[in-house]
A protein has these predicted regions:
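Beta-strand->loop->alpha-helix junctions that form or flank phosphate-binding loops
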Residues: 32, 52-54, 93-97, 135-138, ...
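Residues in the short beta-alpha loop(s) of Rossmann-like NAD(P)-binding domains
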Residues: 11, 34, 140, 218, ...
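Phosphate-binding loop of NTP-binding sites
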Residues: 58-64, 73-216, 220-229, 425-436
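Residue-level signal for inorganic ion chemistry
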Residues: 21, 69, 110, 139, ...
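N-terminal leader/targeting and accessory segments in enzymes
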Residues: 1-94, 98, 430-433
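Nucleotide phosphate-binding/pyrophosphate-handling subdomain across enzymes
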Residues: 3-4, 16-20, 24, 255-355, ...
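Short internal beta-strands
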Residues: 27-33, 212-216, 337-339, 354-364
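C-terminal helical cap/extension that packs against the catalytic core
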Residues: 37-50, 345-400, 435-436
Length: 436
């Protein structure tokens, strides 16, 4: 490749890519539209030239200097780098393409609008319990280019977001599962069709048709599933629930009553994880043990406390209306705290979740309130404290208060984790002394 590798976007992944390229002695050029202190210090430490993002018309000149362009997740589809690269005949890559080039160890992958991190965590645990060193990577805290530095790893379990799949030159992981599909990230993708197309690339590099794993209960995923795919989620699929037992290809794995989590979405995640883990080298008993012990991840339908007869549930990770509808179907009649920064998604169907009452928060408070208008009691709150107080009043006695925002957190918080922790802090202060 003639010319330096241009790395666009110096978030967690971009910085890991810089590090990986530099330590391998490759010539690198870094660009960030809004470089923060971490980006600057990373470039400085590695002696990499950090170029200010040019105006849209000057991108071609910059890209022509490069041999390849590695694009960080979250760079929107309409970014001028894509047109410039196409015009200059320069290849766009995702970090997974670099990992492919440098490391030949097996990897399996998980994509879907909801449930990715949960299934990655389950698969890694099932493989670990089977005696393999399984390392979660990708959309997690550890980019794949950093994870491959772990010489002890036997297998990588990759969380593959639509951003990563869309940018990859050739995505390769086997087995690979697509969990579900619902509108999301329309602030990044040009439209829904582009988002669906990106997700469908998860199966591009499977070693055999059966390594394409599909949720047949999801109409979009089922319609996209290649011939010979391994299915789950429907009564006649390879993996299904029958008479209260999770069954994989005719073998009973675990009784649902023994599972630590068994809401409807938990059962779909469990089936997906079993299929992927078994095809990646796990054994059935390890899968069963994992499901008996896995109590879920923080901020995903996590029980916080019960105060004065009201249960509080933190589902801050729900950043799409689809995720919030899933949460409401698991907790019918809950008082819902909902809102934040909407990612260009349609809120119209949310009222179908039929909450007892709604407290709308954040930038999207007004459109959220409008979405539920007429279906239940709706109020708006201007802080999380106020939201919890209002929700507690509405749930008084025997109810459930569910924080499931259906939006990103970036209006009031730095992340969904920060938002969830704030909610937990407020709830626990109610539990502690009865006052906020």
């Amino acid at each position: 490749v003639s010319g330096p590798v241009l790395v666009l976007g110096l978030g967690v992944t971009g910085r890991a890519v810089l590090e990986a390229l530099s330590t391998r002695g490759l010539d690198v050029l870094a660009v960030d539209d809004r470089p923060g202190p971490e980006a600057r210090s990373c470039a400085e430490r590695l002696s990499v030239e950090l170029v200010d993002s040019p105006n849209p018309t000057s991108w071609t000149g910059l890209v022509e200097r490069a041999g390849e362009v590695v694009v960080s997740p979250g760079i929107p589809d309409g970014h001028p780098v894509f047109a410039a690269a196409a015009a200059a005949g320069v290849q766009i890559l995702d970090e997974s393409d670099l990992a492919d080039r440098w490391d030949a160890r097996p990897r399996c992958a998980v994509t879907g609008t909801n449930g990715k991190t949960t299934v990655v965590t389950l698969v890694a645990d099932m493989l670990q319990r089977s005696g393999l060193v399984a390392v979660p990577a990708g959309n997690t805290d550890t980019p794949l280019v950093a994870a491959i530095d772990d010489v002890d790893a036997d297998v990588f379990v990759v969380e593959a977001s639509s951003f990563r799949l869309g940018h990859a030159a050739a995505f390769s992981a086997s087995p690979a599962v697509w969990l579900n599909f619902a509108p999301d990230h329309l602030d990044v993708h040009a439209d829904l069709a582009v988002y669906e197309e990106a997700k469908a690339r998860i199966w591009e590099g499977v070693a055999s048709p059966g390594d394409a794993v599909a949720n047949l209960a999801d109409p979009v995923v089922a319609a996209r599933a290649p011939s010979g795919a391994t299915g789950f989620g429907t009564p006649d699929a390879a993996c299904h629930i029958r008479s209260g037992i999770l069954i994989l290809e005719g073998s009973p794995v675990v009784e649902v009553s023994d599972m630590a989590r068994s809401m409807p979405h938990d059962l779909e995640n469990a089936q997906a994880a079993c299929v992927v883990a078994m095809r990646a080298g796990a054994n059935l008993e390890a899968c069963a043990e994992s499901l008996r012990h896995f109590s879920g991840l923080e901020h995903r339908m996590s029980f916080v406390a019960e105060v004065a007869g009201v249960r509080y549930v933190d589902d801050s990770k729900a950043t799409t209306p689809h995720a919030t509808l899933t949460a409401m179907s698991s907790l019918p009649g809950a008082v819902l705290i909902v809102g934040g920064r909407n990612k260009g998604l349609d809120l119209a169907g949310l009222a179908n979740g039929r909450p007892r009452a709604v407290v709308a928060i954040g930038e999207a408070a007004e459109p959220m309130a409008a979405a539920f208008e007429g279906s239940c009691h709706v109020v708006m709150a201007s802080s999380m404290e106020e939201a919890v107080m209002l929700a507690s009043e509405a749930a008084a006695g025997t109810g459930v208060v569910l924080l499931s925002p259906g939006c990103s957190s970036f209006d009031w918080y730095g992340s969904y984790v920060e938002r969830g922790r704030d909610f937990q802090r407020i709830v626990l202060s109610l539990a502690g002394d009865g006052s906020p």
